[in-house]
A protein has these predicted regions:
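N-terminal intrinsically disordered/low-complexity leader segments
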Residues: 1-7
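Helix-turn-helix
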Residues: 12, 20-54, 58
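Amphipathic alpha-helical interaction segments
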Residues: 12, 82, 86, 90, ...
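Hydrophobic alpha-helical connector segments
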Residues: 58, 72-102
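Amphipathic alpha-helical packing segments from all-alpha helical-bundle domains
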Residues: 65-68, 85, 101-103, 113-140, ...
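Helix-loop "lid/cap" segments that line or gate small-molecule binding pockets
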Residues: 92-96, 106-115
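Hydrophobic/aromatic-rich alpha-helical bundle segments in the mid-to-C-terminal region
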Residues: 117-125, 137-180
Length: 180
């Protein structure tokens, strides 16, 4: 019983950390802010995580894993090009731009990677390799998949930076049309 409660509490903390990470990056939110968003006090934090970096890294890797799982759930009959088109249609949408619930964490973190612990860069590198393989039509198509990923991430980051509006919408449409 106690382990279930502890696991549920840990999951609430991770959900709050994930939302904070997407909104403000991994460095800015304090432990107090994350715990408050989870409806908890700071005092219980260290029963679940050894540090703020450990919390944010776990939230980051969970979010990345969810992205890959959503692509794994796509029809296996789709070609890499068709998968990239479907991913781009969602990834470069207003809904994804304006969402913080299950949004991709990369646009919020890519600018901070140089200042984060190496474990973040390692997790990102692994994710990029795995995603490129998922989105490639063949092993020879991996560079095209990497280019499209860079375009989608950069397009979404710019659209989010611009905020909702016509220019932001144009950035999303332009990036989406460039992904082939």
């Amino acid at each position: 019983m106690m382990n279930d409660k502890k696991a549920q509490t840990r999951e609430r903390i991770l959900q709050a950390a994930s939302a904070a990470l997407i909104q403000r990056g991994p460095a800015e939110p304090s432990v107090g802010e994350v715990m408050g968003a989870a409806g908890l006090t700071v005092g219980g934090f260290y029963a679940h995580f050894e540090s703020k970096d450990a919390l944010m890294l776990e939230a980051f890797t969970q979010l990345l894993a969810r992205r890959r799982a959503s692509i794994d759930d796509m029809d296996a009959q789709l070609t890499g090009e068709e998968r990239r088109g479907l991913v781009a249609a969602f990834y470069l949408s207003r809904k994804h731009r304006d969402s913080t619930a299950q949004a991709c964490p990369i646009p919020a973190t890519v600018g901070e990677m140089a200042r984060l612990p190496d474990a973040f860069r390692d997790a990102l590198s692994e994710h990029v390799e795995l995603m490129a393989a998922q989105l490639a039509a063949s092993p020879e198509d991996t560079d095209k998949a990497l280019a499209d990923m860079a375009l989608m991430i950069g397009g979404l980051a710019l659209a989010r930076a611009l905020g909702p509006g016509e220019l932001s919408d144009r950035v999303l449409r332009a990036a989406k049309s460039a992904v082939r």
